[in-house]
Each structure stands twice: as C-alpha cells, then as structure tokens.
Design a protein with these regions (language model features):
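Short, charged early-sequence alpha-helical segments and their helix-coil boundaries
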Residues: 47-63
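C-terminal amphipathic alpha-helical interaction region
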Residues: 4, 8-16, 24, 28-30, ...
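N-terminal interaction modules that seed assembly of large macromolecular complexes
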Residues: 16-48
Length: 124
C-alpha cells in the first residue's frame, strides 16, 4: 500500500475497534477470542513497523559475530552450531550481547514492555 492509511495504521485501527467497541459488546468466551484477535493485530502491526529493521540488524550482528555472510536463517543455524559445540568460551561471551540485542528486538515486536531489560551488568 502506498497511500495512507498504511497497513500498520489499518491494523492499529482494527485492534482499537476490537479492544474497544467489539469487546464491550460481547461476553463470555468470545471476549477472550476478541482480545486474542486484537493482540494478534497489534503484533502484525509492530512486525510491519519494526520487523524489517530488526531482521536487518539481526543479520548484521550475527554475521559480524561469525565473520560470515548469508541469510538470517543460515547465519542463525551457524551460530547455533557454534554455541552447541560449546568449545569456545570466548565466542560464547562475544555471542551474549548479540543474542540479547536480537532477543530485545524480537520482544519489542512480540511483547512490548518486556524489551527494556538492562543487560549491561550481566556476565556470562
């Protein structure tokens, strides 16, 4: 979509409608389903707004850590294999801030408010 409203704005409006007027008009088990639908619309909205940048950042961070290029999935598979081997403590320490940054980016999309963890004092 090129003009306004954007897809993200439409999803926000759908979520607002579901969580406002629709939720107030229903009762019983359907209320839970309406809440879930509203939450899903908000997740997709945030994915549209933040997902591309988060994926680019993940690919760059993991690629830099590994000194490799590839798709995000390929780089993550290589990272998992290196960590699973558990034979390089220095690599594991270097991976920690990368994994935390990637996780916080994903939380910003999936569960905002849980993405504010301060891991500056964390030690591996």
């Amino acid at each position: 979509m090129q003009d306004r409203p954007t897809a993200a704005e439409l999803l926000r409006d759908i979520a607002d409608l579901l969580e406002g007027d629709v939720l107030a008009a229903v009762s019983g088990p359907i209320q839970h389903q309406v809440r879930v639908a509203g939450n899903l619309a908000r997740i997709v909205q945030r994915e549209l707004e933040l997902g591309r940048e988060a994926n680019f950042r993940e690919r760059a961070l993991v690629g830099d850590l590994l000194g490799a290029e590839g798709s995000t999935a390929e780089l993550n598979a290589e990272l998992a294999a290196r960590l699973r081997a558990n034979d390089d403590p220095e690599f594991a320490r270097a991976a920690w801030p990368v994994l935390m940054a990637v996780t916080l980016d994903k939380l910003a999309i999936d569960k905002p408010g849980h993405d504010a963890y301060d891991f500056a004092g964390e030690q591996l």
